[in-house]
Amino acid sequence: VVPWNAQMFLTATKLAPALAAGCTIIIKASEIAPCSLLYFARLIKEAGIPDGVVSIITGDEKNCAIPLTTHPDIDRIAFTGGPKVAKQIVINSSENFAVTTLELGGKSPIVVFEDADIEGAVNGIIAGNYGASGQSCVAGTRVIVHDSIKKVLVEMLSKRAESIVTGDPKNNETHVGPLCTNKQINLIEKTLKKAKSQGAKIVFGGSRLNQKGYYFEPTLIDCPNESIVSLETEMFGPVASLLTFKDEKQAIKMANNTKYGLGSGLFTNNLARAHRVSKKIKAGICWINSYRAISPIAPFGGYNQSGYAREAGIDSINDYIRTKTTWINISNEPMK
């Protein structure tokens, strides 16, 4: 079961190990944006995969997802999406004890230490928050910066933000495209309004663009404390929230102050610190001096309400096979 964002990558991480293990697969496309996978069905046919090995279906939760996840012939369910739907899938799958892999949301931290290459950190923050219009489960939406470098980092981020072009993704000059639904924009606006009432300040952005389509400005919110609503709400849009810290211990505590645990990023030139802090951050992925790099050979998945199990990497095939112990008596001697 795949969402509407990053459909081909998320399908591939599920389909490849399943095919390698000799399984037949049903892919449930998002009802919001099914066209990519419907076209992919043609490519499956052209590739020579026999009919019935891979099926792609579309439909809503009631008519498609629920019948699939409760069907007795379904042995395994791999889901990418939100925690609310995931909890229902776990309940549904318990009817038949189907094995599940859940890759859910996140409020990933990007921690920038005082010894970091600030330009590199700015690149990571831009890519981690405004790439794909912020519609990414690993978006680094909690930017946690040492207080001694906050001013210069914010200045560099603001300058870079001025050069970001938001518009039609078919135009070559566009950097940030539209959001998928108006519902996302409404959630962003509601969250920003609440954050400002709690004392947060908009550094740049913060508004819906006055043009046709679901466009929202790349946005940075300066948060005075960790209770600001934008630090806990997954908005799935181009919005980052900024916090400052004074020492390493506080940075780790801030990074782990979330119910999620999918991605994380560290920017530092101290290799010992990078290893030390990455071990203490409760997240399934940690990028050091980079952000949002993905490879099919690297395991992908999270902790806590970001889900469990892993996709991609050699271990992913283990979820699609079963271990069987077979004892064979090759002796003609009577059983003792």
What are these regions (language model features)?
Residues 74, 111, 165, 198, ...:
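Conserved C-terminal structural/oligomerization subdomain of aldehyde/semialdehyde dehydrogenase
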